[in-house]
Structures are given as structure tokens and as C-alpha cells.
From Swiss-Prot:
Keywords: DNA damage, DNA repair, DNA replication, Ligase, Magnesium, Manganese, Metal-binding, NAD, Zinc. This is DNA ligase. It comes from Porphyromonas gingivalis (strain ATCC 33277 / DSM 20709 / CIP 103683 / JCM 12257 / NCTC 11834 / 2561). One of its GO terms (biological process) is DNA replication. Pfam families: BRCT, DNA_ligase_aden, DNA_ligase_OB, DNA_ligase_ZBD, HHH_2, HHH_5, Nlig-Ia. It is an enzyme of class 6 (ligase). DNA ligase that catalyzes the formation of phosphodiester linkages between 5'-phosphoryl and 3'-hydroxyl groups in double-stranded DNA using NAD as a coenzyme and as the energy source for the reaction. It is essential for DNA replication and repair of damaged DNA. The lineage of its organism: Bacteria, Pseudomonadati, Bacteroidota, Bacteroidia, Bacteroidales. CDD domains: BRCT_DNA_ligase_like (cd17748), LIGANc (cd00114). Zn(2+) binds at residues 408, 411, 426, 432. Belongs to the NAD-dependent DNA ligase family. LigA subfamily. GO terms for molecular function: DNA binding; DNA ligase (NAD+) activity; metal ion binding. Residues 61-71 have a biased composition (Basic and acidic residues). Residues 590-669 form the BRCT domain.
Length: 669
């Protein structure tokens, strides 16, 4: 008998799930479900809240817009909220949209403008007297990040408007994108440098525009399309003509924009781009429909989350059927073994797909995969497409179930699986060639030792037995390099110069490059801030490590395990003898200990001092800064417009919110 879940319980469960996915999508830019699943859960929650209004709550995901606002940029309030659009997936719901618009306009005729829905980062540009003065991300819809310096590097963004008939004050909204060709180039470069790949062009665009160095942004060739204009001064009489006006002023407006006089025109537009979108140079994830007349838009107004005069139509992810040839396995630098499906080549979203992710052993068992199975594959933006189903009716009687390997595919060592882990690992860290080469590539990455060497050269050096661990780089000689195929004196000198320069890399970069399990770039910075030398970190206890914000028992155990191994201690000594930086250049000395042992989070905007000045005050008084709220947070220095997610988590954990005045009194006592 199916268990009946009380409405109140289901409502809270949906809110919890949606909040988690909003955080992963909007804050981490790392979604774990697709838009279709998210929208289905959101619709279910909206229906339950309508049916049971006594369980409605102002902090429900149905009453808010997600946030992509990050620390490190000035927060700016939008003159007009940047709201999201309601989504629909079929023609019946488009018909419902037409009905609602008609009722809202009391039967008056209206036109619809159909546009492509670009899949990038929403941006608001402010122009004064034809000059770009500010660029702000969507953020939480109310507040966003000032990324003007980065946006100025995008060549499709006009710094000065063309002509002279533009209004004195103008806001233009659009989408920042990374073209597919540029995405492939950047990922190829990152792979060669041993850096993690971007999952999709949207993540890459978002990560790029939030870089603190505009030079990095300029080197990634972002693009931008624009789709809405605001001004208190007169503009063209309707939305379509305003887009044409924007094009004349120098903005990039999609050629696909179409004026539709009927539902049939809209359906024809959707059908057309169901296939044409697959050949576009940038990512799209649907169609946007807008009422054309601004006066009618004003009459229809807004809900708490979205305009009533616009809606988004989302295409289903492209799904194809192909044959699973066999399963191969890859070994990462940490020893994790990942299964990969090798497929009969098939065309998906304009690219030929030969492989698909199988995640782990549990996924293979859950799908009950057999050799030679016909599988359904989707490519929803990931680098490697995913298998979403199996055509069991087409299964051959000779097909054998796929059993996850018990041996490392590279060194034949029996695999292990730690309790609570989904992945199997090869424990032969020092003898497994793939792990060794993976660690060498990781160490040379731009955010680590930054040695200018590609995986092909590392493979060559490894095959000649010239390198086995990262300390071996510092023992290489010109004579050795000149024995390699294709290496001349100039190439050898360039590599040796890069290796020499890596000795001066910051301590936290070298710590990251050591490849300690679970110690990524951010964790390495946190560890280096508390333990300003490798020796101090090696002497730390588990109890001390877990006191650091966002350092849990798992990370602490990995750090302790790394330093417990003799070969790692010997590696560190070799790096020290080679002259590699293993301690911070300077250690800041607090001017007081009023905040000693306190972990502080800063959120919002302030009147008396800037965020950076308050961060300096915390550190000068012996406190430690953290970017997110946790059970280890001592208090939050809360300004106006504090982020809703931080406020919600603070209330849940009972973390104190401290005002500017309270904080200044505290450090002046």
C-alpha cells in the first residue's frame, strides 16, 4: 500500500529540494538536475501552496528569484528588478498564456515577438549620454555584481552608441555568451594545462565574467546578444521596433527575432528553431515570447517572480538511440576509476558523439546495462553526454551484464571502495602510471606551479623515466631534454625557465599543486592562511584542522594521511632543497586579538566603510574571514540588502547578525 505523505510534509520537502538545487544552479553554477525536473517540482509546489494556503510561507522558493551574486565585486541595486520568466514545454501551455494575456487585455488584439532564449549570463548595461557607465549581473534580481571592467572587454558590447538619437539615460539587457568554438578552444587549453574543464558554455561564461582580472576575460572572446531596452525618455512605440532601434545603436540583436500575429506564427517559429538551433554558434535553451506593445505590457504587469506579458518555451533535451559497444575505464590522479560508455557514433546537437558518462558502478547496476545494449543518450550541455535509458526490448539474448571492473585498468591493482563513497579507487598511488601522470599534469596547472608544459611532453618524459613525481621536474637538465624528439635548445630553455619560475609561485599554489585529496584551490588557500608553512600544516592535528571554516573531518583525514606517508615527506624535502616556496612570504600580525578565534562572514552593503575595509578590520583584530555561513561562523557582519540565502542559513543555525555599529563598538572596546 502506497504511503500517503501529508501535504505539509511534501511542501517542506519540495522547498528543501528546490532550495538545494537553486543554490547549486545559481550560486555554484553546477546544476545536478535539468530544467524540466526543476520546473516540474516548482509547479507541484505552486499547486500545493495554492491548494493549502495555510502552509504558504514568504521564504518559499516560489516567492523568490535565484542568486548568482558572488563575493569580490561591488554590489549594485538594479533600477528595475531583473525577474525570471515562467517556463512552458508544450503548445497547450502556450495556448494558456495566450488566454491569460487576452483576458488581461480584455479581449484587445495583441502581437507577440518571438526570440531565441540564449543560455548564458544575464546582464544589465547602463548608458549615459551614449557612453557605457555600468554593467551589472542579474544577481538575485534586486542586487547584482558590478562587472563593468570585464564587460568592457567584450567586443560585441558597444562602449559608445552609434548615431545621436539615443536617450540620455538608457538601460539595455541581454545575455553574455561563450561561443561553442571558443568554448572548445578554452577547454582544450585547460586540458593541456591540467586544469578542470568547464562543464558547458554557460558555466564558462559565468566563470569568466566573474574573473577579477579583466585580461583573462579579454582572452576568452565572450559574445553578447541584447533583447530589452528601458528608458524614462521616449523610445520606439513597440518592443520589436525598439530591438531594431538597439541594432542601429550598435547592439547585437539576433536575426531570429520575429513579429508574430497569431499562435500559428508562434508555433511555426518554434518548429523552425527546433532544428535550426542545433546549428547556431552559441548555446540556446528555448524560445521567449513577449507581448509587443509596451503599453499592454504595463497593463498586464508582473507576478512576484515574472512578467505576465512574457513566457519562455523550453525544448526537450535532444535524445537519440545508439548501440553501446563496450565499457572502458579511466583512472584519475586521485585513483578514482570512472566508467565510460563507448558508443556507435551518433549525431547529437550538431556534434558526433562516441562516448557517454556512466558515472560509477551503482549507475551501471541501476541501469542494468548489458554488452551490445541499445541505449538512449542525451546531451544537455555536459562535455560528455549521458545515458538516460536502455531499450531492453532490443536486447540480444547473447548480451552479458556489464560488471564493474575489480582491477585497476592501468596497473591491475585490486580496487577498493571506501564506506560512503560512490567511486572505486586504485590504492596503488605510487605505482599506477595514470595516477602518477595525472598528478604531474595537475602540478603544472596554471593555478598550481604554472609550468608551461603539455600532457604530451609529460607523457614523453614519463616514458623515458625522467619524471615520476613533481620533484623530478627540478632535476631536469638541458642535456636530458635535448634527447627528446622535437626538442631544440630554445624549447628546452623555455621549459627550464618555466620550471625555475615555478619555484617562486605562492605557497598556497604549490600546496594546491601537491594534489592532496579533497584539497582544491579554495581549500588550499584556507589552509595556507591558517598554516603559513608546509611544516606547520604537517604538524596540525585533526582537531585543529576541523576548526577551519569549511574544513570537515574528511578533508582533515586526507591532509593527515598525505603527511603520514614517507614518500610524501621525502617529496616535500626534495621540493625544499630545489628552492620551491613552501611558506608564505609574509604573515600578517594582528593589531589586536579582539576577534581571536572568531570566524566572520560579511554580507550586504555598508554606509561607513567598504566590504574590503571591513575584511581588513576583521583580520587586523585576529579574526578569520569566511565566504559562507556554517556552524563554525561566529557572527555575520550584516549590511543592508544582505543575501537571502545567508540570512536563511544564519537563522537556521542560530548565527548572530551584527550591525555596522555593533561591530565597530566591538573592535573599539
Amino acid at each position: 500500500m502506497e504511503k500517503i505523505v501529508p501535504p505539509a510534509v511534501r511542501i517542506e520537502e519540495l522547498r528543501r529540494i528546490l532550495r538545494e538545487h537553486e543554490y547549486r544552479y545559481y550560486v555554484l553554477s553546477s546544476p545536478t538536475i535539468d530544467d524540466f525536473e526543476y520546473d516540474a517540482m516548482m509547479k507541484q509546489l505552486e499547486e500545493l501552496e495554492r491548494e493549502y494556503p495555510e502552509w504558504d510561507s514568504p521564504d518559499s522558493p516560489t516567492h523568490r528569484v535565484g542568486s548568482d551574486k558572488t563575493e569580490g565585486f561591488a554590489s549594485v541595486r538594479h533600477d528595475r528588478p531583473m525577474l525570471s520568466l515562467s517556463n512552458t514545454y508544450n503548445y497547450d501551455e502556450i495556448g494558456d498564456f495566450y488566454r491569460r494575456v487576452s483576458e488581461g487585455l480584455q479581449g484587445a488584439p495583441f502581437e507577440i515577438v518571438a526570440e531565441l532564449k540564449f543560455d548564458g549570463l544575464s546582464i544589465s548595461l547602463i548608458y549615459e549620454d551614449g557612453m557605457l557607465v555600468r554593467a551589472v549581473t542579474r544577481g538575485d534580481g534586486i542586487m547584482g555584481d558590478d562587472v563593468t571592467a570585464n564587460v568592457r572587454t567584450i567586443r560585441s558590447v558597444p562602449l559608445r552608441l552609434r548615431g545621436d538619437d539615443y536617450p540620455r539615460m538608457l538601460e539595455v539587457r541581454g545575455e553574455i555568451l561563450l561561443p561553442f568554438k571558443e568554448f572548445d578552444r578554452i577547454n582544450a587549453q585547460r586540458e593541456a594545462e591540467g586544469e578542470p574543464l568547464f562543464a558547458n558554455p554557460r558555466n564558462a561564461a559565468s566563470g569568466t565574467i566573474k574573473q577579477l582580472d579583466p585580461h583573462i576575460v579579454a582572452g576568452r572572446n565572450l559574445d553578447a546578444y541584447f533583447y530589452y531596452l528601458y528608458s524614462d525618455e521616449p523610445l520606439a512605440e513597440n518592443h520589436y521596433d525598439r530591438l531594431m532601434q538597439a541594432r542601429q545603436w550598435g547592439f547585437k540583436v539576433s536575426d531570429a527575432v520575429t513579429l508574430c500575429c497569431s499562435k500559428e506564427d508562434v508555433y511555426a517559429f518554434i518548429d523552425r528553431f527546433d532544428t535550426e538551433r542545433l546549428t547556431l554558434p552559441v548555446a540556446t535553451d528555448g524560445i521567449v515570447l513577449k507581448v509587443n506593445a509596451p503599453a499592454q505590457q504595463d497593463l498586464l504587469g508582473f507576478t512576484a517572480k515574472s512578467p505576465r506579458w512574457a513566457i519562455a518555451y523550453k525544448y526537450q533535451a535532444e535524445r537519440v538511440r545508439t548501440r553501446l559497444q563496450h565499457v572502458s575505464y579511466q583512472v584519475g590522479r586521485t585513483g578514482a576509476v570512472t566508467p565510460v560508455a563507448n558508443l556507435d557514433p551518433v549525431l547529437i546537437s550538431g556534434t558526433v558523439v562516441r562516448r557517454a558518462s556512466l558515472h560509477n558502478a551503482d549507475f551501471i547496476a541501476e541501469k542494468d546495462l548489458h554488452e551490445g545494449d541499445f541505449v538512449y543518450v542525451e546531451k544537455g550541455g555536459e562535455i560528455i553526454p549521458k545515458i538516460v535509458g536502455v531499450d531492453t526490448d532490443a536486447r540480444s539474448i547473447d548480451g552479458r551484464p556489464i560488471v564493474f571492473t575489480v582491477l585497476c585498468p592501468d596497473c591491475a591493482t585490486p580496487l577498493v571502495r571506501e564506506q560512503g563513497e560512490a567511486a572505486y579507487y586504485c590504492p596503488n598511488a605510487e605505482g599506477c602510471p595514470q595516477q602518477q601522470k595525472g598528478r604531474l599534469e595537475h602540478y603544472c596547472g596554471r593555478k598550481a606551479a604554472d609550468i608551461n608544459i603539455g600532457p604530451e611532453t609529460i607523457e614523453l618524459l614519463y616514458s623515458r623515466n625522467m619524471i615520476r613525481n613533481v620533484a623530478d621536474f627540478y632535476a631536469l637538465t638541458e642535456e636530458q631534454l635535448l634527447t627528446l624528439p622535437g626538442f631544440k635548445k630554445r624549447a628546452a630553455a623555455k621549459l627550464l625557465d618555466s620550471i625555475e619560475a615555478s619555484k617562486a609561485r605562492p605557497y598556497q599554489a604549490i600546496l594546491f599543486g601537491l594534489g592532496i585529496r579533497f584539497v582544491g584551490e579554495t581549500v588550499a588557500k584556507k589552509l595556507a592562511a591558517v598554516y603559513p608553512s608546509i611544516d606547520a600544516l604537517a604538524a596540525a592535528t585533526s582537531e585543529e584542522l576541523v576548526q577551519i571554516d569549511e574544513i570537515g573531518e574528511r578533508i582533515a583525514a586526507a591532509v593527515l594521511h598525505f603527511f603520514s606517508l614517507r614518500q610524501n615527506r621525502e617529496l616535500i624535502e626534495r621540493l625544499r632543497l630545489a628552492g620551491v616556496s613552501l611558506e608564505a612570504e609574509t604573515v600578517s600580525v594582528p593589531v589586536s586579538a579582539r576577534l581571536a578565534g572568531k570566524t566572520v562572514v560579511i554580507s550586504g552593503t555598508f554606509e561607513k566603510y567598504s566590504r574590503d575595509e571591513y575584511k581588513a578590520m576583521v583580520e587586523d583584530n585576529g579574526g578569520r574571514m569566511a565566504g559562507s555561513v556554517s556552524s563554525k561562523t561566529s557572527f555575520i557582519l550584516a549590511g543592508s540588502d544582505m543575501g537571502p540565502s545567508k540570512r536563511e542559513k544564519a537563522e537556521k543555525l542560530g548565527v548572530r547578525l551584527m550591525s555596522e555599529e555593533e561591530f565597530l563598538r566591538l573592535i573599539e572596546e
